[in-house]
């Protein structure tokens, strides 16, 4: 087996480098040939994956967090939308949400899945907005959760506290907004707080945003939170870790294959934890689009 490993050395608060070194040694012991490329700037792995997806590889391995997966998959799609080679996942980020839906709990789990060589097909989501098009493997959101992520990024020097700061600031200025959306031909209007479009169950590590989502069912799960008080919002957030937020009267859950969303004003998007584009958007599921080791 000959693999290309694309590594974010800064993933998981700089754990990526150590995980890469450990992985390379484990592959060597199994007689698996691996060429490793370290990311040296945002977007670097997009460029490498786009170029190498047509290369003589038995697979491309993404080593990092959900954001690393986002770069690698979009690079592969850019280089060849047919995605001729499978993707391997070696989680080394702070969240690693998607890897949990593959059944990965430890580095050893991930390594064995890749070394075994067996693959399965899973879905991707595709998003088109005014200025960009991209695919996502985990989740696409906008509204409160995305606003918090954007605000937290500006406080990243505070480490893990940055999200607490983001929640506090965005909650203080909480405002609902008009949302118009259509799912598989059904038109709906709401006074909204956030929308999360999920391919997999989890986000942000162990937050079970879409408890019923499956990565190979040909559907996307849409969870929306409608207008509520600040206090009610703060009580809702812990419920997401248990997946019980769907029982709240302000929460609605939909599934679909094709959907569009329009907000006033435009809202920033966070695909797989990254920041890219704004509403309005059109989103489609790409059933069985990519092969993954596992």
Residue ranges and their predicted role:
Residues 1-60, 186:
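ATP/NTP phosphate-donor binding region
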Residues 9, 63-65, 90-92:
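Glycine-rich beta-strand-to-loop/alpha-helix junction loops that act as flexible
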Residues 30, 39, 78-193:
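Catalytic core of DAGKc-family lipid kinases
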Residues 45, 67-72, 97, 122:
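Short glycine/serine/threonine-rich phosphate/pyrophosphate-binding segments
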Residues 68-82:
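Short Gly/Thr/Asp-enriched flexible loops that form oxyanion-binding sites at enzyme active sites
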Residues 141, 145, 196-209, 275:
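Glycine-rich phosphate/pyrophosphate-binding beta-alpha loops
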Residues 156-162, 206, 211-232:
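Gly/Ser/Thr-rich active-site loops/lids in small-molecule metabolic enzymes
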Residues 183, 214-215, 224-294:
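ATP/nucleoside-binding phosphotransfer catalytic cores, i.e., glycine-rich phosphate-binding loops
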